[in-house]
């Protein structure tokens, strides 16, 4: 297989993959339900009012000793009704908690709004990203509540801050902000909820203590959910947000990492599975929210829809709290960016998969390895653009033996091209005899006809994984390179890098030997630089920088290989010009 065919295979695979992704996005947009546009959406503060479905309420289990949680059965068929106690004086006031990285608005039961203070919405703007929001059209919040068959539980607005005031802020010199809330039920039952924010951390600790000072046992279970009306993204290669996975993901030690896109949310009948030691999350480009329960407590993991809203929920653990006893359950709520270093500090198995390099484990592992190298280069170079350049250089050095083997195979094929032409002329239209004679020649001269293609196939997973690393890494968001490139996740404003990419591809074509190429292939080759140039004009500049550096190094390697095998680059250029 000559260099031309190898290049065409790679080029058309790239085009086909991008067109396939584009077609899928357009089809999804065309078939997307219009519920968000046609149905009335309740106010954001009412989103958590619904209690879990009665068919899926886990039965409470007795506590062996004070503070020990019960287990959660897979699915309970017990008819359950939550007896929510209304707030004593209307809805609870909204309280604002502020750390150095988060500003939260909550009512004790739901986090209604969450701003990421270190991530502005735009490069030149000052407004931070709002991950959770009370937006009327697309509300998105996180809720933690209690449900029970017979015992009283707090309803919407049931929790009240123990301390006076509605604004609490992490002070300078402090590393922890602790804000307790309490619900005082009838007959001496109360639930004390404590929110803990830490400096530099996006995981919020939420601890519940059920204190039973009544004369009768109290039973109930905690539920934690993420509820969202998904935003319909503008589709196309010009919008990096639409490249990334948007939907629910969850993890269990048994099944590993799983995911469900918003557009396919209920295609497989939702989710209803008991899991211990997992987590559940909603993902979007660069950011995510997740409920992370205690590693030793079982929960029922549920995906369902509530009108226009997609819901990801944990139900359980369940408790039976004897008189005079206390039960405790704790969970973490992550509201923040997909920052590799901070996610690793949480020490949660599988949570690194929210950085969705691929749904396939092997591609995700390759992507994680590439980012590890990229981040170490950044720590040395202090610039993500130069880190991309350095990563490409390292990859080309590592893959140089494969590139060398590919060129050697192609050079050997060119050497025997006249003999192949003679065989074709000798056997004419007898394809069977021609193929037999060709294989005998390959065997005699020790030529591997796949030698030019195999190295490329080995390299392709690496380059595809690197593509997703550059798309997914929030570290590159709004990061500058130099000069006119001030945001590696935005397109090149002056189209300089796409123009360089066209020039490099054209030069590579001229330097690629093409003996025996047919006219159709020649015409296809002439248009490939323009096709790729048009595609690269509107994708993130970080990706184009990768292609330019990779193409430039490939051009230099091509020139070097030609010289190494005793050929003259000028002769090849003149031959291709004819």
Curated annotation (Swiss-Prot):
Keywords: Cell inner membrane, Cell membrane, Chaperone, Membrane, Protein transport, Transmembrane, Transmembrane helix, Transport. It is found in: Cell inner membrane. Its main location: membrane. The gene is yidC. This is Membrane protein insertase YidC. Interacts with the Sec translocase complex via SecD. Specifically interacts with transmembrane segments of nascent integral membrane proteins during membrane integration. HAMAP family: YidC_type1 (MF_01810). The chain crosses the membrane at residues 6-26, 354-374, 380-400, 451-471, 495-515, 529-549. One of its GO terms (cellular component) is plasma membrane. One of its GO terms (biological process) is protein insertion into membrane. InterPro entries: Membr_insert_YidC (IPR019998), Membr_insert_YidC_N (IPR028053), YidC/ALB3/OXA1/COX18 (IPR001708), YidC/Oxa/ALB_C (IPR028055), YidC_ALB_C (IPR047196), YidC_periplasmic_sf (IPR038221). It is a multi-pass membrane protein. Gene3D superfamilies: 2.70.98.90. One of its GO terms (molecular function) is membrane insertase activity. Belongs to the OXA1/ALB3/YidC family. Type 1 subfamily. It comes from the Bacteria. Required for the insertion and/or proper folding and/or complex formation of integral membrane proteins into the membrane. Involved in integration of membrane proteins that insert both dependently and independently of the Sec translocase complex, as well as at least some lipoproteins. Aids folding of multispanning membrane proteins.
């Amino acid at each position: 297989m000559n260099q031309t065919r190898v290049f065409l295979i790679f080029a058309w695979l790239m085009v086909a993959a991008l067109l396939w992704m584009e077609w899928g996005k357009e089809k999804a947009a065309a078939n997307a339900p219009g519920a968000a546009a046609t149905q009335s959406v309740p106010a954001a503060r009412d989103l958590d009012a619904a209690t879990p479905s009665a068919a899926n309420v886990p039965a409470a289990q007795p506590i062996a000793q004070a503070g020990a949680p019960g287990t959660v059965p897979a699915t309970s068929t017990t008819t359950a009704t939550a007896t929510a106690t209304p707030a004593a004086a209307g809805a609870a006031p909204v309280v604002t908690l502020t750390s150095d990285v988060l500003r939260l608005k909550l009512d004790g039961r739901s986090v209604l709004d969450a701003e990421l203070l270190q991530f502005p919405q735009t490069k030149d703007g000052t407004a931070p990203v709002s991950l959770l929001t009370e937006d009327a059209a697309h509300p998105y919040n996180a809720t933690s509540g209690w449900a029970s068959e017979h015992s009283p539980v707090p309803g919407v607005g049931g929790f009240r801050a123990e301390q006076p005031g509605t604004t609490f802020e992490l002070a300078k010199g402090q590393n922890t902000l602790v804000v307790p809330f309490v619900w005082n039920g009838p007959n001496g039952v109360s639930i004390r909820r404590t929110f803990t924010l830490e400096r530099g951390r996006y995981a919020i600790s939420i601890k519940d203590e059920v204190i039973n000072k009544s004369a009768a046992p109290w039973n109930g279970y905690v539920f934690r959910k993420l509820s969202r009306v998904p935003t319909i993204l503008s589709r196309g290669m010009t919008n990096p947000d639409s490249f990334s996975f948007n939907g629910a993901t969850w993890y269990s030690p048994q099944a590993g990492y799983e995911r469900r896109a918003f557009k396919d949310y209920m295609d497989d009948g939702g989710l209803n599975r008991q899991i211990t030691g997992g987590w559940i999350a909603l993902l979007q480009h660069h950011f995510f929210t997740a409920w992370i329960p205690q590693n030793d407590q079982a929960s029922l993991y549920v995906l369902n829809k509530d009108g226009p809203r997609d819901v990801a929920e944990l139900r359980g653990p369940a408790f039976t709290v004897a008189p005079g006893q206390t039960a405790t359950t704790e969970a973490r709520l992550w509201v923040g960016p997909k920052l590799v270093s901070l996610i690793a500090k949480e020490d949660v198995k599988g949570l690194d998969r929210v950085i969705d390099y691929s749904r396939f484990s092997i591609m995700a592992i390759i992507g994680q390895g590439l980012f590890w190298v990229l981040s170490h280069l950044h720590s040395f170079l202090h610039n993500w653009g130069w880190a991309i350049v350095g990563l490409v250089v390292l990859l080309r050095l590592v893959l140089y033996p494969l590139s060398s083997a590919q060129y050697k195979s192609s050079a050997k094929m060119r050497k025997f091209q006249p003999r192949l032409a003679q065989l074709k002329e000798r056997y004419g239209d007898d394809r069977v005899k021609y193929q037999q004679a060709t294989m005998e020649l390959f065997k005699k001269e020790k030529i591997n006809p796949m030698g030019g293609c195999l190295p490329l196939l080995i390299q392709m997973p690496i380059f595809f994984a690197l593509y997703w690393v550059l798309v997914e890494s929030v570290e590159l968001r709004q990061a500058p390179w130099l000069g006119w490139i001030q945001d590696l996740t935005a397109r090149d404003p002056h189209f300089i890098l796409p123009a360089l990419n066209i020039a490099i591809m054209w030069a590579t074509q001229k330097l690629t030997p093409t003996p025996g190429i047919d006219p159709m292939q020649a015409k296809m080759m002439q248009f490939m630089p323009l096709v790729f140039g048009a595609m690269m004009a509107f994708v993130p500049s970080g990706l184009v920088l990768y292609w330019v550096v990779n193409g430039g190094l490939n051009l230099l390697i091509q020139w070097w290989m030609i010289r190494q095998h005793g050929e003259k680059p000028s002769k090849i250029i003149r031959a291709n010009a004819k």
